[in-house]
């Protein structure tokens, strides 16, 4: 299964990559409520059947073990939900989406943690691959159930969603740089607010996805290969602000080429 993706993993390993992160754009369609990998026709809750949470956790553990056994590649990290707070991911059938509330994420992570412990697996479970930094410390175009993520997962007072003492879950939040790159004043301000909240709860931070998209109006959007200095300086500015002000300990690019 997924031979193309697995071939890319092998090619990356052959070229010296030694850390691998897996993430989910959707649970398998046979576990989803609408039978699709998109969230079409639904709101901002997990597209996962109520009786399939345990099955989903077992599936993820099986995949991590299977890839290591068959391909010799160990997933060091796995994130069960990708951009669960995204305001785009229930609008229509355009894109795979993985919306979920903080409670649904916490339930899944606890089950996956137990599965890993039972199998003596040390793969780290990452949260939350947020689509927007603002959802990590407040709300933005969503309600409280999918916002305030740092507080929800790492403040002990959040008894329903606290994951700070969960095995295989590091004190680390993952987020994507999209939507917060302009204007310049907000580029810095949002990252300073993010860092203040992370520091308050003693949580680290990785920036795990960004690229030039059509909404990057300052440089005219991103299509094809763009080798211009204007775009290079724009990307450098994002990297600088993510590392200096948000103190990202890891910074990851998404797509090498953008096309329509």
Over which residues does each language-model region extend?
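Structural recognition of the beta-strand scaffold that forms the well-ordered cores
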Residues: 19-24, 76-80, 124-127, 171-175, ...
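Extracytoplasmic/secreted cell-surface and envelope-processing proteins
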Residues: 30-32, 87-90, 134-137, 181-189, ...
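Structural recognition of alpha->loop->beta junctions
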Residues: 72-75, 153-173, 231-250
């Amino acid at each position: 299964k997924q031979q193309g993706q697995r071939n890319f993993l092998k090619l990356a390993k052959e070229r010296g990559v030694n850390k691998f992160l897996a993430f989910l754009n959707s649970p398998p369609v046979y576990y989803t409520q609408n039978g699709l990998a998109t969230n079409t026709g639904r709101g901002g809750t997990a597209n996962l059947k109520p009786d399939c949470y345990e099955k989903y956790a077992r599936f993820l553990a099986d995949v991590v073990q299977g890839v290591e056994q068959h391909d010799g590649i160990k997933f060091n990290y796995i994130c069960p939900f990708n951009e669960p707070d995204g305001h785009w991911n229930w609008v229509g059938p355009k894109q795979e989406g993985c919306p979920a509330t903080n409670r649904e994420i916490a339930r899944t992570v606890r089950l996956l943690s137990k599965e890993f412990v039972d199998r003596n697996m040390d793969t780290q479970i990452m949260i939350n691959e947020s689509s927007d930094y603002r959802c990590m410390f407040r709300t933005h175009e969503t309600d409280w159930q999918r916002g305030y993520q740092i507080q929800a997962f790492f403040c002990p007072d959040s008894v329903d969603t606290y994951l700070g003492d969960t095995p295989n879950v590091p004190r680390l939040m993952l987020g994507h740089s999209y939507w917060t790159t302009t204007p310049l004043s907000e580029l810095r301000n949002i990252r300073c607010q993010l860092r203040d909240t992370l520091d308050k709860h003693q949580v680290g931070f990785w920036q795990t996805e960004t690229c030039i998209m059509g909404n990057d109006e300052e440089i005219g959007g991103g299509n094809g290969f763009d080798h211009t200095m204007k775009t290079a300086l724009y990307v450098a500015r994002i990297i600088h602000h993510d590392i200096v002000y948000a103190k990202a300990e890891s910074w990851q690019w998404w797509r090498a080429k953008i096309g329509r």
